[in-house]
């Protein structure tokens, strides 16, 4: 009989331990069962890792986290080599346990009250002109962590007034009104919240989340700040159909979203949701054309695209794929 998983405060649960807590069960893949990666999914590594190590050292020195490392992003080498990173606030332990995500699950510790200042000082030290701030889900906090986001935005603007700030937030489920009240006074320059996948796959891929709730959050933020660009992202390769993706795009536009990212899902380990298929680059191009026809002003679509991948270029409307 399998020993029950005990969740202790501050302890990170990953892979099999994390998946054991998910209500929708699936068997981990065995060796040889994974789909073979096509040639277009091969990553070119930089010739030297000096810049990569420099970014990591700065993060360690200030006791900060990057979603690039915590979520095992395939673009880590490229982004760190360019001196950029997506900062993950509110700790490295998520209260959700989505089976596509490599971020650790568990009972997080109290937020670090000094994190906003440390984050702002780090961004100033790195001389960043565009930053993306994301977080784990914090269902244990009364406002879902919204005030911590606002504190970070405020400190960054004090330290680096010319730096543009994009926030990639959780859904603040059950706490939307409190979160919106916080963002009313301290909005970012771009507000991003990912739908991740088609609603049919939510019970499997996003347990604890709600498709309509996420759409409402995006809509409410746009209503509060009509000139604020709102953004959302989707993964492909989880078993969705292209027709389902197009319907999600229509739903996003109906809720005022103007910026879009579409990328290929990659399985972090054999314990995570398997890749159902690798979507060829030409399909991403076709979906981008549909997105632009639907009225999206920005659409970054390609196998390696992630929400924060070259987010500064995305915001400028440049080609990212």
From Swiss-Prot:
PROSITE patterns: RADICAL_SAM. SUPFAM superfamilies: Radical SAM enzymes. Residues 80-297 form the Radical SAM core domain. GO terms for molecular function: 4 iron, 4 sulfur cluster binding; lipoate synthase activity; metal ion binding. Pathway: Protein modification; protein lipoylation via endogenous pathway; protein N(6)-(lipoyl)lysine from octanoyl-[acyl-carrier-protein]: step 2/2. Coiled coil: none annotated. [4Fe-4S] cluster 2 binds at residues 94, 98, 101. It comes from the Bacteria. It is found in: Cytoplasm. Its main location: cytoplasm. Keywords: 4Fe-4S, Cytoplasm, Iron, Iron-sulfur, Metal-binding, S-adenosyl-L-methionine, Transferase. Binds 2 [4Fe-4S] clusters per subunit. One cluster is coordinated with 3 cysteines and an exchangeable S-adenosyl-L-methionine. One of its GO terms (cellular component) is cytoplasm. It catalyses: [[Fe-S] cluster scaffold protein carrying a second [4Fe-4S](2+) cluster] + N(6)-octanoyl-L-lysyl-[protein] + 2 oxidized [2Fe-2S]-[ferredoxin] + 2 S-adenosyl-L-methionine + 4 H(+) = [[Fe-S] cluster scaffold protein] + N(6)-[(R)-dihydrolipoyl]-L-lysyl-[protein] + 4 Fe(3+) + 2 hydrogen sulfide + 2 5'-deoxyadenosine + 2 L-methionine + 2 reduced [2Fe-2S]-[ferredoxin]. [4Fe-4S] cluster 1 binds at residues 68, 73, 79, 308. Pfam families: LIAS_N, Radical_SAM. Transmembrane segments: none annotated. Its cofactor is [4Fe-4S] cluster. Belongs to the radical SAM superfamily. Lipoyl synthase family. HAMAP family: Lipoyl_synth. This is Lipoyl synthase. It comes from Tolumonas auensis (strain DSM 9187 / NBRC 110442 / TA 4). The gene is lipA.
